[in-house]
């Protein structure tokens, strides 16, 4: 009986919130240009355009405004309980990020689902959509996120099979299938299955926001990224008023090293996100833009973007995008410029997501080791070990592995600083090999510095230029067109006496940073080398 009262209370609070949100929303500009979506329902004809706008927002992960818009629909037509599907889909959060619904979000979603079951949608198809999303929330508290993701994927696969002519069912099936992709699976099997569904849909619906969006995610891997350029260059024009739609193309631009495109689209995304008070999205876009500018040698612009982002708080969103970007941007600014003393002085900030704290301790430790302060590096290494232990205890395997990659790299540079070159290379190589087996998370444009690139720099310091060049060039396969990689490759080739290859890499460095600040020592060296030939 108590459970029934609780469910009723939650449901009632949802309906009240829906009504309030609808009244508040009456004076808002509801979304703008978001792409074309067709999702027939049995709801009142007057709310159908608003419902489809909410679905378009859902496809572009504009969750806060989509939630308000679905609430607006339900307030205008209380019989339109298929909105429970949309509401519950929003509360699962980004299905590619792996974080899933919060406990509070799961309770709200279940209340909406229960309300839809008490007042069922008028058609079987709509009821099936509600039950498909309900599969994720079933026994929510007693299942790990991976089990929920798999249940969701199977439910939407069944929905798509039952309604083969329902293109929205096919598109959501592809999304949730892509959401089962493991970072450890470098066959990218789930992505390949999603692509097989989405590419025909893209030909059929070139202005559909979800199709372009999910294609980008499904091509977001080193060997696949080139195939994602068509969708990447299309998506921002499909839904230019959605902050995430403006950011998403840069997932592909980063993978292929197209930095100018990444800067442009992320600046637009950050501006639109701040206008919409979507702070996690604004920080996320800013981190990608900072990363891209640093590759172009635009250190001043990177710093300005970071400082602009820091003028705004991250809000109370459970998304890790804010704390990750807040920790990553200053670490990138120091590490990409080789400012080891600056890196060592970065200030750690406590976070509910401990892996974001690890970014700062990693940068501090590398900076301290490379500027000769071994004692400080060892203290920060202890913090990394402690964070790694916490993540393992929480069974957060992916991020525990990422922190272990950082810990091994730090141990390698500490060994290097102590004069134990062989041990340093051994540890740094272990870090690079582990990183290669663990695909980067979508929250980041890239690790603070690629581990294999760090290995190349260590070998170069040890006067092993041939070995260093081998590692730099291997790193380019996964992280192309990076400033520090070209600089390291050029210096390694120069030290080997390979003048032709050195000149080629120095020329790439100069071309890459032709619109940069021009004050990095690596660039001065490159210009001098080219001038003397």
Mark where each language-model region is.
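Residue at a conserved register position within TPR or TPR-like alpha-solenoid repeats
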Residues: 57, 91, 135, 177, ...
């Amino acid at each position: 009986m108590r459970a029934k009262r609780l469910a009723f209370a939650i449901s009632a609070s949802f309906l009240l919130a829906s009504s309030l949100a609808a009244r508040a929303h009456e004076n808002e500009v509801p979304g703008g240009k978001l792409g074309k979506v067709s999702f027939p329902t049995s709801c009142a004809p007057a709310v159908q355009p608003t419902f489809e706008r909410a679905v378009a927002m859902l496809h572009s992960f504009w969750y806060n405004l989509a939630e308000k818009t679905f609430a607006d629909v339900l307030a205008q037509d209380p019989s339109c309980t298929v909105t429970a599907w949309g509401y519950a889909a929003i509360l699962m959060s980004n299905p590619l990020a792996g974080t899933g619904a919060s406990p509070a979000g799961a309770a709200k979603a279940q209340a909406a689902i229960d309300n839809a079951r008490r007042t069922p949608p008028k058609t079987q198809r709509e009821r099936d959509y509600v039950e498909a999303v309900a599969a994720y929330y079933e026994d929510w508290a007693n299942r790990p996120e991976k089990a929920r993701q798999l249940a969701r994927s199977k439910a939407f696969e069944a929905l798509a099979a039952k309604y083969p002519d329902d293109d929205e069912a096919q598109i959501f099936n592809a999304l949730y299938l892509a959401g089962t992709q493991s970072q450890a699976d470098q066959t990218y099997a789930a992505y390949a299955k999603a692509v097989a569904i989405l590419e025909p849909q893209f030909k059929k619906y070139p202005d559909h926001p979800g199709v372009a969006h999910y294609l980008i995610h499904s091509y977001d891997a080193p060997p696949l990224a080139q195939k994602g350029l068509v969708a990447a260059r299309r998506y921002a024009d499909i839904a230019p008023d959605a902050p995430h739609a403006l950011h998403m193309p840069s997932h592909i631009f980063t993978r292929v090293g197209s930095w100018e495109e990444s800067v442009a689209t992320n600046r637009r995304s950050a501006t639109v996100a701040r206008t919409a008070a979507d702070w996690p999205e604004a920080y996320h876009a800013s981190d990608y833009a900072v990363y891209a500018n640093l590759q172009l040698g635009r250190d001043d612009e990177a710093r300005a973007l970071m400082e602009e982002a820091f003028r705004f708080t991250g809000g109370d969103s459970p998304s890790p995008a804010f704390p990750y970007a807040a920790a990553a941007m200053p670490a990138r600014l120091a590490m990409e410029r080789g400012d080891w003393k600056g890196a060592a002085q970065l200030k750690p900030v406590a976070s509910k997501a401990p892996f974001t704290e690890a970014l700062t301790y990693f940068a501090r430790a590398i900076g301290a080791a490379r500027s000769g302060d071994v004692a400080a590096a060892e203290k920060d290494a202890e913090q990394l070990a402690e964070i790694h232990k916490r993540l393992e205890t929480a069974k957060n395997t992916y991020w525990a592995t990422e922190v272990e990659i950082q810990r091994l790299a730090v141990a390698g540079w500490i060994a290097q600083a102590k004069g134990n070159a062989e041990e340093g290379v051994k540890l740094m190589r272990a870090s690079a090999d582990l990183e290669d087996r663990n695909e980067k998370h979508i929250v980041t444009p890239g690790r603070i510095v690629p581990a294999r690139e760090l290995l190349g720099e260590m070998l170069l310091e040890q006067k092993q230029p041939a070995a260093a060049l081998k590692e730099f060039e291997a790193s380019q396969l996964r992280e192309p067109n990076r400033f520090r990689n070209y600089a390291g490759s050029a210096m390694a080739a120069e030290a080997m006496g390979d003048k032709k290859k050195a000149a080629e890499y120095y020329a790439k460095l100069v071309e890459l940073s032709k619109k940069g600040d021009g004050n990095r020592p690596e660039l001065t060296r490159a210009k001098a080398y080219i001038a003397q030939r």
